Amino acid sequence: MLSLKKYLTEGLLQFTILLSLIGVRVDVDTYLTSQLPPLREIILGPSSAYTQTQFHNLRNTLDGYGIHPKSIDLDNYFTARRLLSQVRALDRFQVPTTEVNAWLVHRDPEGSVSGSQPNSGLALESSSGLQDVTGPDNGVRESETEQGFGEDLEDLGAVAPPVSGDLTKEDIDLIDILWRQDIDLGAGREVFDYSHRQKEQDVEKELRDGGEQDTWAGEGAEALARNLLVDGETGESFPAQVPSGEDQTALSLEECLRLLEATCPFGENAEFPADISSITEAVPSESEPPALQNNLLSPLLAGTESPFDLEQQWQDLMSIMEMQAMEVNTSASEILYSAPPGDPLSTNYSLAPNTPINQNVSPHQASLGGCSQDFLLFSPEVESLPVASSSTLLPLAPSNSTSLNSTFGSTNLTGLFFPPQLNGTANDTAGPELPDPLGGLLDEAMLDEISLMDLAIEEGFNPVQASQLEEEFDSDSGLSLDSSHSPSSLSSSEGSSSSSSSSSSSSSSASSSASSSFSEEGAVGYSSDSETLDLEEAEGAVGYQPEYSKFCRMSYQDPAQLSCLPYLEHVGHNHTYNMAPSALDSADLPPPSALKKGSKEKLADFLDKQMSRDEHRARAMKIPFTNDKIINLPVEEFNELLSKYQLSEAQLSLIRDIRRRGKNKMAAQNCRKRKLDTILNLERDVEDLQRDKARLLREKVEFLRSLRQMKQKVQSLYQEVFGRLRDENGRPYSPSQYALQYAGDGSVLLIPRTMADQQARRQERKPKDRRK
């Protein structure tokens, strides 16, 4: 009903509604299920009961297709389409659905026709065989006199339309002939009766809870039915010619592997060099389960496939891949490493101990094949073959092995994203290290993205220079940790450690004051007008203008700020860190004395940039005392200081200007301080007033509450006194005519209501007259 509801036209619905309004009962289910096979043929095509299928010649297109083009079973006869659908479904998890068919072997009863049809022409020959018991409505239909035939015949043959009791002999003979012909062709009740198939599902659910004996019997009968073919002309059953399971298995595995190869092509250096034929020969066909062999049989066999076939095929393919990967791994490990019996690396990991890719980085070997990163998780040692076999790579020195990031600087991205356990930061002299399972993924995904070849040309560094840096500054926590190696490669990872590196690389007080000016952004902290005025003088001493790097942050792209760092001149620019030590150019390295002298000059230039304009002018005029004394000394001491030295007019005028500007600055600071103190005092006064206001509001609320309570008490007292008053006759006074009035001396008078109202009006007018 639900599957065919959308095909009903609007006119049919309107006609049904009209009939229901008139009072005629319309049973739509009978028209949509078993009573209308033509409607189902229009929608789904003719069923197999009416189609003469060529069982012996399915592929012969000269006589027409064996299956109707509109049949829903057409897809099962195309092997390529079925295999493609199975291969595409390998990466999806499918919950298997079990179907259990139970068969009961018994003899048919002699009276196979119900009592309403006494004619013996409809009775079939009773013989022992397999009878489907999936019809749950045997008892119901036998009691219905409208059904002209028994349930036994309905299960074995087609469904006849409901007939009355006045059938002629010709009609009964025609029905008998058609019925026998349908039974001979193999068309049962389930082909025609749609509601019968719906009821079969309910019966199957009940039969699933049965014993194991019925289940095995049902599977055997189903297998027997699948192995039998029915002749279209004679209706005879004969066993099917099943091809050998070995050929079918090998052919299907070849097709699956070929489809996998087309979906995920391997590179030139594939991890699986063996061909497909050798793989299929290595796997014995006898080890295939029966479910897989049944699934790989010819599509001529009918029946439902096992729900575990796809899962079993996927497991077989994965086992083949693992076997071949194990062959490659064992051959590689025999060449590279022969482990002793007690080696923990061989017992725990079964891998050859290779050098991690972070220690021997070669830009030419950083890229992998097209599909290598998918299989890298299964065999990580395959990727390490070209790295471990290359003898031209230079390992790090033991003094620098504690921090590999000092060797590569910003190019070693693994130190920025992964902990030291995965980065391979252990000492090289400690022994063989564990392989890095993420090295290949990082090399292909990260190093290709940042163009490692360009970095090797622009920003490389030398391990020998790193060792000299460590000897120069007597600390491996200063410049060896993420420090800059060239003015153009100052990256964001070095900005966070610039304060620590600058403070630990020198021991003098001037260096500590210089380190305090660094922020986390890596630039100088205080900027004044003296920096812009003295840039030209400083550039002459530096002699180098660094170029901007594509990895440099915007805050680092000031050449004046980069040139003032004292340790940048020791950084060489020889980018051949993959070469041997003999190939290094020693002419680029200055002597240690020149390095120390240059560092002092750089430090002096850096301190010069931190001085103000007046300090630079005082140094240029060679004034013998500091600006602090000029500004902060009292008048008497200042005059004595000037009298001790022989100063020129220009020097005296400069000293007076410095003192005047310093005093003005101090006066301005004092003025700002007084203003701030005044503002703070006003804020405190405002807070005090707000507290007083809140206190007065609370008191007002208390007064109003007490006044309200007093009025209530006076009102109650007034009513009590007025109720006790009596006239001469002993009657109480009326509240509408009389009222009580309080006198100034405390006495209470009883007056008429009109007089009391007049006095109240006069008292109200007095405040108004005063306001005017």
From Swiss-Prot:
The chain crosses the membrane at residues 7-24. The lineage of its organism: Eukaryota, Metazoa, Chordata, Craniata, Vertebrata. The gene is NFE2L1. The record marks W103, L104 as: Cleavage. It comes from Pongo abelii. Residues 476-523 have a biased composition (Low complexity). Interacts with KEAP1. The modification Phosphoserine is found at S528, S599. The cholesterol recognition/amino acid consensus (CRAC) region directly binds cholesterol, as well as campesterol and 27-hydroxycholesterol. Has much lower affinity for epicholesterol. PANTHER family: ENDOPLASMIC RETICULUM MEMBRANE SENSOR NFE2L1, NUCLEAR FACTOR ERYTHROID 2-RELATED FACTOR. A motif (Nuclear localization signal) lies at residues 761-768. It comes from the Eukaryota. Residues 682-696 are annotated as: Leucine-zipper. This is Endoplasmic reticulum membrane sensor NFE2L1. Residues 379-383 are annotated as: CPD. It holds the Pfam family bZIP_Maf. Keywords: Activator, Cholesterol metabolism, DNA-binding, Endoplasmic reticulum, Glycoprotein, Lipid metabolism, Lipid-binding, Membrane, Nucleus, Phosphoprotein, Repressor, Signal-anchor, Steroid metabolism, Sterol metabolism, Transcription, Transcription regulation, Transmembrane, Transmembrane helix, Ubl conjugation. InterPro entries: bZIP, bZIP_Maf, NFE2-like, TF_DNA-bd_sf.
